[in-house]
């Protein structure tokens, strides 16, 4: 496994591998890898000749009062996890390499960036789309793997790829959960034991919502009300930012719940913002 920090060197290497007919799979991450990331890496290993993992905590997708400074970082740990999974290359650029002086070009996916997390994290998806567009141009992947836990992010990237004709196939992979139901996230590290216990109400609420739908309930308000009830019982709940049921393509709220619609939530447990979702 090789670690590459220079974008130009990375791009040259990837282009030469593609010339040799190699199929490149790419897993973009912000590091502090967990089983969710590893499941993406395994998908890539299965479907491609070369697997690249990028590790870059992207400052332009964090708002002024968000957790950029304290976001967990441990490169040596990430590196050894990647080695165990037989990753071929880690792309690990510095901030200066990605955003040199004078940088002023941004990518914005207008409609899909609105609503859900977009309402609470202005500029977030502009930061995500911009860094991912840059990474696509540097890594030149055939296939790229994103977790469905960040459902809105996945939709934003799919739209960007379509609208800007990126020659890449975007693969959305299922949410990976802890045995007790908690969706895996690098931010889970912030939770105390008691807060982690409280956070279980999130997945509990989602599973209950799915059960209601399977029992024939299609009124989104009834389902959302029940979800709020369950989450509100969490001892360390600080705030429910949103509970929405949206169409999985447009991300617009629905009047009647149908199969493949998505229930998405964002919740503060203590000082930690957690998101999760489930498909009906």
UniProtKB/Swiss-Prot annotation:
(R)-pantoate binds at residues 61, 153. CDD domains: PanC. ATP binds at residues 30-37, 147-150, 176, 184-187. Keywords: ATP-binding, Cytoplasm, Ligase, Nucleotide-binding, Pantothenate biosynthesis. GO terms for molecular function: ATP binding; pantoate-beta-alanine ligase activity. Transmembrane segments: none annotated. The reaction proceeds by a bi uni uni bi ping pong mechanism. Belongs to the pantothenate synthetase family. This is Pantothenate synthetase. It comes from Sulfurihydrogenibium sp. (strain YO3AOP1). The gene is panC.
């Amino acid at each position: 496994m090789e670690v590459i920090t220079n974008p130009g060197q990375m791009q040259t290497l990837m282009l030469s591998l593609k010339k040799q007919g190699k199929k490149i799979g790419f897993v973009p991450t912000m590091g502090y890898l967990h089983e969710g990331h590893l499941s993406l890496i395994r998908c890539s290993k299965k479907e491609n000749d070369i697997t690249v993992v990028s590790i870059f905590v992207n400052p332009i997708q964090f708002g002024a009062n968000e957790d950029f400074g304290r976001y967990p970082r441990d490169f040596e740990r990430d590196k050894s996890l990647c080695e165990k999974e037989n990753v071929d290359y880690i792309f690990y650029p510095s901030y200066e390499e990605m955003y040199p002086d004078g940088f002023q070009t941004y990518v914005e996916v207008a409609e899909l960036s609105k609503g859900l997390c977009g309402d609470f994290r202005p500029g977030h998806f502009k930061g995500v789309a911009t860094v991912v567009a840059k990474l696509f141009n540097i890594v030149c992947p055939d296939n790229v793997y994103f977790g469905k836990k960040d459902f809105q992010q996945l939709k934003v990237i799919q739209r960007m790829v379509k609208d800007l004709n990126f020659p890449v196939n975007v693969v959305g992979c299922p949410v990976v959960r802890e045995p007790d139901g908690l969706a895996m996230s690098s931010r889970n590290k912030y939770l105390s034991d008691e807060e982690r216990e409280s956070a279980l109400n999130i997945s509990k609420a989602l599973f209950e919502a799915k059960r209601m739908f399977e029992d024939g309930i299609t009124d989104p308000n009834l389902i959302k009300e029940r979800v709020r009830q369950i989450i509100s019982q969490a001892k360390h709940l600080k705030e429910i930012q949103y509970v929405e049921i949206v169409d999985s393509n447009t991300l617009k709220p629905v009047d009647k719940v149908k199969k493949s619609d998505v229930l998405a939530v964002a919740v503060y447990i203590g000082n930690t913002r957690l998101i999760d979702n489930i498909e009906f």
